[in-house]
């Protein structure tokens, strides 16, 4: 059962914490953003790539200390299908590092998350 794996990982690491991944492009270090923008231009693909690279670095730093991550779907959806792909790749990467993943996809959430959901479905993408 899934929660048995989580409990086992908590016991192994002696840590019941979960790291939330609520990425916004402005949270990503500038050097990572710059590398993605050079590679893909100022596009949603570049934004999603920068977030993925940052997530991988976070996961690498945390996987031996924190048993689980909780990516918030709204923050990935803000970057179109490329962001949703980044969510899937983040999940796979965390799992490959032995982390338990709890995707937070509830639609009735706090203000910041509701803003992220609203941003995910704009007339045009202006948040790059």
Functional labels for PLM-detected ranges:
Residues 17-21, 69-71, 101-103:
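Hydrophobic faces of well-ordered beta-strands that scaffold small-molecule active sites
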Residues 22-26, 74-76, 106-110:
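Active-site beta-loop-alpha junctions enriched in small/polar residues
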Residues 72-82:
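Glycine-rich, proline-tolerant flexible connector loops at the mouths of alpha/beta enzymes
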Residues 84-101:
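Alpha-helix-loop-beta-strand connector modules within alpha/beta enzyme cores
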Residues 126-127:
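Conserved small/polar residues in nucleotide/adenosyl-binding loops
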